[in-house]
A protein has these predicted regions:
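Start-transfer (signal-anchor) and selected internal transmembrane alpha helices
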Residues: 1-31, 296-303
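Extracytosolic helix-loop segments that constitute the early lumenal/periplasmic catalytic or substrate-binding loops
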Residues: 44-75, 82-85
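Short acidic/glycine- and proline-prone juxtamembrane loop motifs at membrane-interface regions
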Residues: 147-157
Length: 304
């Protein structure tokens, strides 16, 4: 059963939840919330501002060289410098710490909107729009998303490109053999950006690649094109691996023991964070979901 016709009382419940979720998200910004523990001007933001200043004030080549730890200039991050390159050259609000934080907060609001559109793009014929808004609000409850939104941290850039990637992935799956190369190019581009924004998100392009190669109904030629696009977009990252001698910048690699020590517990930690944002997709994956509203009580019954 699909959620096209919703009870009026349930619509009211949905509206109230949506309103207060969005309101609390906005209030969190004005009160400088730090629910994940990494925010604050003395927290991770000081590294963010240092890295941004590096690409804002130095020659591009010198700044890139600094990520390899070969200079007295310090680059402090486990991610590639793409976040800082884009902001240094494209973000007009980087003259002060406060204006930069505001710009990332606005960017995060767009990320939330993009989450809504990615859900709507996939389920628009099956689910009432208000229910999609309700499901998309889950991202506003994440302490990681909230803290990154309020303190200009790095995490939300990867989340942003995940949602864009899923929009193009859905378009390709819906079109099957009629999918065009432009959509395939954009899918490869944005899902590759996921890795540049956070190496852990390598799972995203791998998922798309394997799905379209094995289960996808696109033509063989387009499958080859997809592989070639991914190969081309991986070249800058291959250069960074050559520059660093590792998959993350030198200073963080040495501090974390990357490729030297395996932290098994981090696998569960990372998967938990990623899975949080996929809850609406997993919830809606079930075809037989029955919604029951009796005596002002809401219950959901899933039939396998």
């Amino acid at each position: 059963m699909v959620f096209q016709n919703l009870n009026k009382n349930f619509k009211l419940y949905i509206f109230v939840v949506i309103f207060f979720t969005i309101l609390l998200f906005l209030i969190g910004f004005f009160f400088q919330e730090n629910s994940a523990g990494a925010g604050g001007f003395e927290g991770d933001f000081q590294h963010v501002w240092n890295n941004l200043s590096l690409f804002k004030n130095y020659d591009f080549r010198d700044a890139l060289k600094a990520t390899a730890g070969q200079d007295e200039i310090k680059y402090i991050s486990s991610r590639t410098p793409l976040i800082y390159i884009l902001n240094a050259y494209l973000n007009p609000l980087i003259e002060s710490k406060y204006s930069y934080i505001i710009s990332i907060f606005i960017f995060s609001i767009f990320t939330y909107c993009l989450f809504y559109f990615s859900l709507k793009n996939k389920y628009q014929d099956k689910i009432n729009s208000s229910f999609i808004v309700f499901l998309s609000c889950i991202i506003l409850l994440s302490p990681y998303f909230r803290t990154s939104s309020y303190w200009g941290l790095e995490e939300n850039f990867g989340i942003f490109t995940i949602f864009i990637s899923f929009i193009f992935f859905t378009r390709i799956k819906n079109k099957n053999k009629s999918a065009n190369n432009f959509d395939i190019l954009l899918l490869a581009f944005f899902s590759s950006l996921c890795v540049y924004f956070d190496q852990k998100l390598l799972i995203i392009p791998l998922f798309f690649l394997f799905d379209l190669m094995i289960e996808g109904k696109i033509s063989l030629r387009k499958k080859i094109n997809l592989s070639l696009f991914y190969l081309v977009f991986s070249i800058p990252f291959m250069y960074l691996i050559y520059l660093w001698g590792n998959i993350i910048p030198v200073r963080d690699a040495e501090a974390r023991g990357t490729l030297q020590t395996i932290y098994i517990e981090n696998i569960g930690y990372s998967l938990t964070i990623i899975a949080f944002y996929f809850v609406p997709f997993l919830f809606l994956k079930k075809k037989n979901i029955f919604f029951i509203l009796k005596n002002n009580k809401i219950s959901i019954r899933i039939k396998g």
